[in-house]
Amino acid sequence: MRRWLLKSKLHRARVTGTEKDYEGSISIDAALLSEADIAVGEQVQVVNVTNGERFETYTIEGESRQMELNGAAARLAETGDVIIVISYGLYVKDEQPEPTVLLLDEENRISERE
């Protein structure tokens, strides 16, 4: 048996912009993607703490401290909203991996690792 478990989380990120006229996705700082072990193109769940929206999209590499929602997802958040970006991994039943959890400050810098 396999289970979907938390693999990575960017907690309390701030939306830096929205671009509705784009194919889709979320642009995330390349260094944050690397630190969180989230691949470019990986499916992620985004939880908007500010308004309660939840949705799935995929990642693209962004600029330093960027956290920008693109395409249809851009309608689900506004600049300044607090979000959580979550990725999951498929693990065998007895596997209990330690997830990578990064808490971010108001400027999308890592403030703490859990």
From Swiss-Prot:
EC code: 4.1.1.11
Cofactor note (record): Binds 1 pyruvoyl group covalently per subunit.
Catalytic EC class: lyase
Keywords: Autocatalytic cleavage, Cytoplasm, Decarboxylase, Lyase, Pantothenate biosynthesis, Pyruvate, Schiff base, Zymogen
SUPFAM superfamilies: ADC-like
Locations listed in the record: Cytoplasm
Catalysed conversion reaction: L-aspartate + H(+) = beta-alanine + CO2
Keyword Chloroplast among record annotations: no
Quaternary data: Heterooctamer of four alpha and four beta subunits.
Family stated for the protein in its record: Belongs to the PanD family.
Protein name: Aspartate 1-decarboxylase
Species whose genome carries this gene: Haloquadratum walsbyi (strain DSM 16790 / HBSQ001)
Phylogenetic classification of the source organism: Archaea, Methanobacteriati, Methanobacteriota, Stenosarchaea group, Halobacteria
